[in-house]
Amino acid sequence: MLVLGLLVAGAADGCELVPRHLRGRRATGSAATAASSPAAAAGDSPALMTDPCMSLSPPCFTEEDRFSLEALQTIHKQMDDDKDGGIEVEESDEFIREDMKYKDATNKHSHLHREDKHITIEDLWKRWKTSEVHNWTLEDTLQWLIEFVELPQYEKNFRDNNVKGTTLPRIAVHEPSFMISQLKISDRSHRQKLQLKALDVVLFGPLTRPPHNWMKDFILTVSIVIGVGGCWFAYTQNKTSKEHVAKMMKDLESLQTAEQSLMDLQERLEKAQEENRNVAVEKQNLERKMMDEINYAKEEACRLRELREGAECELSRRQYAEQELEQVRMALKKAEKEFELRSSWSVPDALQKWLQLTHEVEVQYYNIKRQNAEMQLAIAKDEAEKIKKKRSTVFGTLHVAHSSSLDEVDHKILEAKKALSELTTCLRERLFRWQQIEKICGFQIAHNSGLPSLTSSLYSDHSWVVMPRVSIPPYPIAGGVDDLDEDTPPIVSQFPGTMAKPPGSLARSSSLCRSRRSIVPSSPQPQRAQLAPHAPHPSHPRHPHHPQHTPHSLPSPDPDILSVSSCPALYRNEEEEEAIYFSAEKQWEVPDTASECDSLNSSIGRKQSPPLSLEIYQTLSPRKISRDEVSLEDSSRGDSPVTVDVSWGSPDCVGLTETKSMIFSPASKVYNGILEKSCSMNQLSSGIPVPKPRHTSCSSAGNDSKPVQEAPSVARISSIPHDLCHNGEKSKKPSKIKSLFKKKSK
């Protein structure tokens, strides 16, 4: 009875007199009391009529409905702040935002109130009874727990306690006894989460998932693909840039190695030049010693000759003649040995200066190529340093990867490397070629007096002027060799001083002074006029004067070469030049098959040069040369700056060959003054024999050591007239020695 009275009193006060943790016991006790004493309950029926569960519509008959009603009353009290029995719009909005922690409560608020602005407990109960959540089964509740609450670990506890939709209001009010003791949820955060989710479905109905947005999925997929593709592209570009940079660094290292090898090669070049200078000094010392010996032999011969001339007795004169003859024989043997050591013919001294000038011009072109290669190297280094600086910044790697600067720098490095390689190959080939030329010729080419001195000495007597371009280093010949061959007139016709030469010297130098081509064709009459001084008839051994040609200006296609100020107006064609050349050569050929000079003439004539064997036998001439002939020969030799020196057989040299002429091996070739260049360094022969050192000209040494008064007497002994060559008089060695002996004895 006491418990029943308490229930009635609690119902009058809104069922809040009994604590929540005792409500289960009260319900259980009231049910037991009602079952045990139905008579008492029947006696108190007016009191039960005031129970709110029975007064509600629809009424609550079961225990679960009672628990649900109590939970709804608790929720209504929490939302009703002013305790007026109704939930206004402001109160529900504040509860949704603060207690349920919803930021956007518009949809929830409209779903809760609908058209009713004042919600009472009866309205809340009716909505709960008609709600879909109220009719949830155990499976629906478990699905809600797993999918929406996301607490699948409590599925077993819900299943054991048979939690259905009608039990959710008890979870929404957070009964500790029910949540902890029955559902066994010990985690506070899980209890709070479960309470908020249960309160949501009790007040606002079941949660509905929004429709699946395929556009978002597509956009997300495309974004993922783009992101992955961008990452892959960035990775590949970074890898490619690193490979490019590594390759560039490797090329730069190889470039530095090539530069170092070039420096080493230049050091070797300097050492080789120093060795060449030392060899030249030693060579000069040997030549000086040989000249001393020759001068001593000449003095001894002169002394014996003076003794022979001053002797009165025939016997003493014969003895002196025999001694002199012995000296001549010794000198002749020595000359023959030297002639055997030398090649078949000698080259004039002017070729040495022309080769030295060619070497200096080639060195200047090499220096220009070297400067260009060094400039390319500096540019490549600067670009590589810029790339390094760019890669050190934050966005430098991406900038370098997406730009074409790496390819450009790589191309510049390869170009600089190629230029250095070509420069090194050119330097090696040039060094080897000029060393071989020096070995074959037997004189210095790389070590010379310099380009200004060579230019002034070789172009001092010329009437045409060469003006180089500004961009090219100063050198006398602005065009190539082919340009000079085609544009310049024949050298013989340009200089009138060469026409006053004796026929012997003319014939000897005609093959060297002949031009390869003619520029302007001429008529037969001027050609015959030009043939006369170059190919003299045997009946006219000397021509004192020559036809004069009117100088005219010759236009040149090369802007670097100025017009010729004085040159003949008409030039010979190739046929007439060949006729002059062969007519001049035939004067040197003597039809004597038994002599040694015949074989030499046949081999030397094929090489387009005068026979050198006549130099040896010029000393054995039975005829004396007068002072007028010697002076005429010297004057003609001084007037011609381009022809070969005629003093091959010096009066004081006793048949020695001229020491300033070049020595060529049989394998060497000379094509009209142009040095043939080898196509490949591998084809160059490294076994070319080194010629003997040259000797200074005997005639020059004799002129320095002897007074001027002794020249006629010496010439009478050792010189041969040019008429011997023109008339074809030639004999063997024994006959010449005997005739010399007879003449001298007289």
Curated annotation (Swiss-Prot):
Residues engaged in binding Ca(2+): 80, 82, 84, 91
Effect listed in the UniProt record for changing residue 91 to A: No effect on inhibitory activity
The entry's keywords: Calcium, Calcium transport, Coiled coil, Endoplasmic reticulum, Glycoprotein, Ion transport, Membrane, Metal-binding, Phosphoprotein, Signal, Transmembrane, Transmembrane helix, Transport
Top-rank taxon: Eukaryota
Record topological domains on the Cytoplasmic side: 236-746
Membrane-spanning residues: 219-235
Biased composition (Basic and acidic residues): 723-732
Positions in coiled-coil regions: 247-394
Tissue expression: Expressed in all tissues and tumor cell lines examined.
Modified residues (Phosphoserine): 523, 609, 621, 640, 650, 661, 665, 680, 697
GO cellular component, one term: endoplasmic reticulum
Biased composition (Basic residues): 537-549, 733-746
Function statement: Plays a role in mediating store-operated Ca(2+) entry (SOCE), a Ca(2+) influx following depletion of intracellular Ca(2+) stores. Functions as a highly sensitive Ca(2+) sensor in the endoplasmic reticulum which activates both store-operated and store-independent Ca(2+)-influx. Regulates basal cytosolic and endoplasmic reticulum Ca(2+) concentrations. Upon mild variations of the endoplasmic reticulum Ca(2+) concentration, translocates from the endoplasmic reticulum to the plasma membrane where it probably activates the Ca(2+) release-activated Ca(2+) (CRAC) channels ORAI1, ORAI2 and ORAI3.
Protein name: Stromal interaction molecule 2
Source organism: Homo sapiens (Human)
Gene name, Swiss-Prot/TrEMBL: STIM2
